[in-house]
């Protein structure tokens, strides 16, 4: 289990490194300052701060998407469905950003709104991050520094291991989010036996890390979206998994170890490997085959009876 934990951490530091590389290439990748948006529905999780973090939370905009960094106080923001549509299922949504920033729009709020439209109570987890430079100029310099992207090869050779990082803060935040949903399940119309978790990029890593290591989270299903694909040690009580990645994502590299791990453990798994989409596509980008993943996810939930209307009667 410890080996799996370290592999996950290494994979998502690689995400940050390679994802940042694309900034110097993308014409619309300029980093702009952004005033912190109002988050009137964000609920503090009170999980503590971040050691050696002198900078306060700040925001920036890139590719038209609001991003948050230097997060020291985790929050959970509910996106509740119309009561006429509500089916009792809940999903914790974890945005990505290499554990150094969070893509709050593309991989957070927009996804939560789409889930709520389908009758699902969605909860965006703004989890604590590793420290970055205090000033936006210094942060931009760091992100734009020269680096070599991994070569595009068809083999599944394991890339060099990046430095290891601790995800204990992030796991604590995820556990606190889950506990809050359970505690307020009746108020929010949530069936505590139908709480799932999906994440994007590093958020997929946190979703997987929570599944493999949490002693308190009992997810009904998980959905890692363009996350690490290496093999893992699957717990006996692991939930069904819906997994998405594109062949032109630098994380793919021909690997499907996590899929094999789930299959070999005898736990239901669905895998969608798309022709194109790259990395960080959120709900989708124009002209990419990966654009239909959300529809497939909804159908998967439907077939597995998570979208059936449910009269919530929780026994905590």
Language-model region placement:
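Alpha/beta-hydrolase active-site loop
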Residues: 138-186, 293-296
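Short beta-strand element of the alpha/beta-hydrolase
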Residues: 87-96
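Primarily recognizes the serine-hydrolase "nucleophile elbow" in alpha/beta-hydrolase
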Residues: 165-238
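Short amphipathic alpha-helix adjacent to the substrate-entry channel of hydrolases
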Residues: 105-124, 260
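Short beta-strand/loop motif that positions the catalytic acidic residue
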Residues: 242-245
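C-terminal catalytic histidine-bearing segment of alpha/beta-hydrolase fold enzymes
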Residues: 268-316
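Acidic catalytic loop of the alpha/beta-hydrolase fold
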Residues: 247-253
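N-terminal cap/lid segment of alpha/beta-hydrolase-fold proteins
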Residues: 28-85
